[in-house]
Amino acid sequence: AGPVTPWPRTVPVRLEPRDDGGGARDDIMITTLGEVRTSLADGSFDPEADRVTTSDGRVLDHYYRDSLGITYYKPLDKSIFPVPPSGWCTWYYYYRVVNPAEVIANAHWIAENLAPFGARYVQLDDGWQGMGERGAGAWRDWSTIDTRFQEIGLGGLADSIRSLGLEAGIWIAPHGQSNTQVARSSKVFLWAPGDSSASTTWEGRYLMDPTAPAAPAYLGGIFKQLRDLDFTYFKIDGQTIVVHEYGDKTKYMHGPVPQGEPREVGAELYRKTLRTIRGAIGDSSYLLASWGTPLEGVGLYNGSRTGGDIVQGWDGVLGAVSTVQRWNFLHNIAWYSDPDVLIVRPPMREGTARVWSTIMGLTGQALMSSDRLIDLPDSRVELLRRVYPATDIRPLDLYRPTNTRKPIMDLKVSHLGRDYDVVGVFNYDPDNSSNRLLSWSALGLDSTALYHVYDFWNGTYYGSWEHGIFIDVPPGDVRVITLVRATERPELISTSRHITQGWVDLRALSHGGSATKPSLSGESRVIGGDPYTLTVGLPRGKSSFRIATARASGSAGGAPVRVSWTSHQGYATVTIRTDSTQVVRWGIDFEPAAPYVYPVTSPQRIEATATGLSNFMLHWPVEYYPRSAYQVEVDGRPVGEAFGARASVAGLAPGKEHRISVRSMWADGSAAEKAAELTWTPTVPDSVYISELEPLSVQQDWEQLGVNRAVRGSALSVGGKEYAKGIGTLSESQVSYRIFGSFARLEASVGLDDGVRRRSPAQAIFEVRGDGKTLWRSDTLSRGSAAVPVSVDVSGVDELTLVVTPVVQPNTDRDDSDPADWLDARLIASPTGSGL
């Protein structure tokens, strides 16, 4: 998994988002790998003291406990598990119809194809216990195993996995039980008057009493038996249910209970059971909590799931990215976050699989796949190999984000003297391509400096440029862009082994030679049978270099090492091949070379199409003659380079005239003499539907924002009436728009969509905020009620936010997945035509 930096140690921290360079204020998620320094940091965080010290000298004591609400915060103990787990889980292919033959077949495949790349765990999920998939009443019986597993036994299965050099994991919902005989005889379960169960939930027909004298022996005995069978990874499910029930059912408990509010009491009783589990499995076993985000176990788990179960396809990706971003502030700080599994199998589109893989690879969260690996085509196996294993990535952003679908994820890496950024640029629209500015200044980079630009997944070098670049991303896909500052010498840009591009594989790196004949040398761990490519960026200008020769040698006793190389305009590659995994020493010598230069000419014209109040798409005819890029300027300020014939410009104030120019560029930095020019004035319409505007941010954990439709794709419908215009959200959501103070009123109707699926009461409160202040708030609205009209004064408001909050009924779980609608929502302009 590459090196692990010392922990706990003081780390840089960002306490709030900043402008992305295009007007959006919460569009970039920043993570770090290594001892990174960045101008984006607002200060530093001391994890042992739980203290933030800001750059201006402010001190925030008990930061995680008080500011972030993590009651039981303590820094993650990384002494035994220095990085998150990487492996495979049975659930999302086999569900409860799992059998040992399939587990072993996948384990063999992992040992041969993915273990060399860092996979370690094989985790058996639900279906091994009681009666497996037959009969819900036996799903929580831990006293027996399903007939499919009785011949080999759990111990035999674990032995088969361990014989392949892998670790065996197992799922269990240990606080519950479905076997009445066990529940009665053990004397450790909650009973109500009349000799009936006091708690029947998903966790089981019966719930263990944490105060019963025999409870530690009962619970510890289950885990000791599994640990004695050589399971070393334990996934315990339904944990938020347990906490809730323990706080709610104290009157049925045998022994004394702590004093306090039900939630606090439930947490303390629950933590008591976790200590019993930890005592049984030991510190050398990995303990993962599951079901929601059970913060009550911080400090006792190694890791925790941070959201609900994923689903296959694009909705699964949206759920994964929201979960990853929402809880990333806990990852590798208080525990290892687990956003659920990675799925890449067809018929999922290749782009969808690439997005999902990138989310996992750039955040370093727990990495468990859940396909029938034997069936994966080579292209999907390749995706897995480039993100395995999980690495020591840690968040810079230590705050609760308002936008959990940020389209840019920036991983800042510092390793062996290399400081570089690996940036994921995501398109969350599965139907339309996107074009987005990646601004150097928004990433905390020097906007006047040259940076080599490399596309990792496509293996494409785009040159070295200043200011920023415009990135085209296909529908429902991602571009992973590596940025390395250009110098007067050749610089290593990328290695092909892992998405972190050097952290996992590169062991040593040094520059040598002279100014006219420079050299690079290093050591890399190369996996047998996996071609290993080093990509080197060459200096930009009238003179540069090419490879004169390259060499590589392997370890003593290793297989022969073969090396090949090529030189190109602006970059060069060296590829190393060997049949056995070994550390390879390599060297590259360069010689002077003159790059080819073409006298570029600019487009003859440019046009602009409005895409929002302050956004527009520039486009121009594709040049017949060669060019390397197009430089876009706005009001005399260079913004970035476009590689295609369009650029999306955002954040320009409406009602003001702006000067736009596009100039063709060559790879050496030479520019066309003249630029194509355009004057553009974004206008303020008399009225505009919210559904016609591009949101500044969208926060909801599931589904995509519905535009003129409900969140799950059906027609907008409230109280039996359908609406043609509006946006569909979930019952826990925030959608923000920048409106520049240009409008006087918001007119709309609101309500819970008729597509609510639950039988239980669905209720929510709708709210309109302007620049963070509440402007209007509804009463509690229920499913089936008619839409409620809204008319709100938004004069002078720059940022408008539409909020929906679910109303939780007593003794029911919180549900944030009901569809909620903003119907016929439109903005009416100020009487003067502009609030600017």
Question: What do these predicted regions represent?
Answer:
Residues 463-503, 568-594:
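C-terminal beta-strand-rich structural cap/linker in extracellular carbohydrate-active enzymes
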Residues 649-668:
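Beta-strand-rich modules
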Residues 1-121, 146, 233:
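Carbohydrate-recognition beta-sandwich/jelly-roll modules
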Residues 601, 606, 642, 676, ...:
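Gly-Asp-aromatic-enriched flexible segments
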